[in-house]
């Protein structure tokens, strides 16, 4: 059996394939570590499912109001138990991660309240939600104030400035775990726990919310294990396991989640309404698969960092650093390299492989964005995908891979496109 010939048939030259195999030879220890975390988290998910006696009746579809939806309600108990929280809201009516965060913020902030980000600027799409960039129905328009404390030059937390902001009166602290389209490191759960503990020492009543997108099941603990009052994420990222076609979750304190449910539906209705529309099998099975799917994506990210760092590109995290989310940032230095990289990811896809991604003015962003994603679920970033804003330092953000072998093919194809365009040579730097 000649695997190299299969790669050749898909458009990978022997030189690029051999380069990848040389990189891969040094990653066995890293991959074993990723597998150990996945094994732990797999047991955690199975334990939560068994505790809540998941059975075939929980897969039944509901329509209309969705009253007495046993599958939906039990899934929320599974999430709450797995993430060690009092309550959970897990719904297909939450359309994306930004929507989930908007629900959580608007449900728990009233006119005159103050929102604090102690980790610098939020993800691009949240700028309009908060009102940093003007938008109708933003938190600012409803009278919610916003404060921001930037990170120190070494990306540490500016504790004196955070303390000063908190003593000025803050209702809710929002902590973005992942880097988004920034080039800072992703925070570990331990770092987030330290920040939460600090905030609670200053003001025990402050609500600490963590944007957990891209981070679920990367470590053996979650921010909710270290004091987060709410954790928020998307089901078309890690916890959906590549099977959930839509959805988001909010896990946390019962009173806070109750308010989120009222905001998502209506006061007085809360979690009692919201039909599952036949999505329960995908939601349950996706959550079951999530630890191993996340492990595949992590292997792809580690492989990408080692490939591109060897070629002289700055990678965040670098090739040796521990992982706290599934995103790999590679600073490519030019728009042409970004486009070629993304064309490679697209060409390696099982869906829309014939399409050429091009930069476009994507809603919610202040610069053109290029996105490559030959995905079964539109916008799914647990599936192999790459994207980034067309602005210096021309960094592309690679994530996902339902299987490790698809992630590997995508990275090799991205390199192949760069080599073919004369933008990269296979010489170690």
What are the functions of these language-model segments?
Residues 38-42:
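Acidic, PIN/NYN-like endoribonuclease modules and their adjacent C-terminal/linker elements
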Residues 3-24, 28, 35, 45-51, ...:
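Conserved PLP-enzyme active-site core in the AAT-like
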